[in-house]
Amino acid sequence: SYINTASASDRFYDDNVWLGIDFCDIYEATGDKKYLAEAEMIWKFIESGTDDVLGGGIYWCEQQKHSKNTCSNAPGTVYALKLYAATGDERYLARGKALYAWTKEHLLDPEDGLYFDNIGLDGRIGRAKFAYNSGQMVQAGALLYKATGDESYLKDAQRTAAACYDRFFGEFTPQGGETFRIIDKGNVWFSAVMVRGLAEL
């Protein structure tokens, strides 16, 4: 995908993953196979962004293969599982499982259950934590549990969801009311994608 007001530049795998997920969702809502065809076409591009460096995973950018990011791999897992649900093709389920396992192994912070941003090809971890990255792993775990019945995926999702609640929500007290927790101020899109995962769970 490209910004429509700019000339062609670098192609980012994560941006195309979001488009693929959208096409899957439109297909689910309409049953129109042209949207499924678009989703499967985009998936071929995503697959071109994988290799055996660091044991697997999807790169962030086609022209700058310096890191493999949670923002490519977590929604990439969701994307694969949505394609599996739409087609019944076991290859998509296998890819979803593999991407999930790779992301968990390389980018999960075992201390709190949230996910780091990226891993460089030198093995260095980009330690920033964003709501959408962890939220997509919640959704991925929930979808894998639905597809397989394996409760380990459900437990993973529940742990990361609880960690999201601890990290990305804060207390709010309305005038004259009782205190409760709401999503912290920040990037609204990141928060919205996190909520997708919480809703799936």
List the model feature ranges, each with a label:
Residues 1-201:
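Glycan-recognition and catalytic cores of secretory/periplasmic carbohydrate-active enzymes
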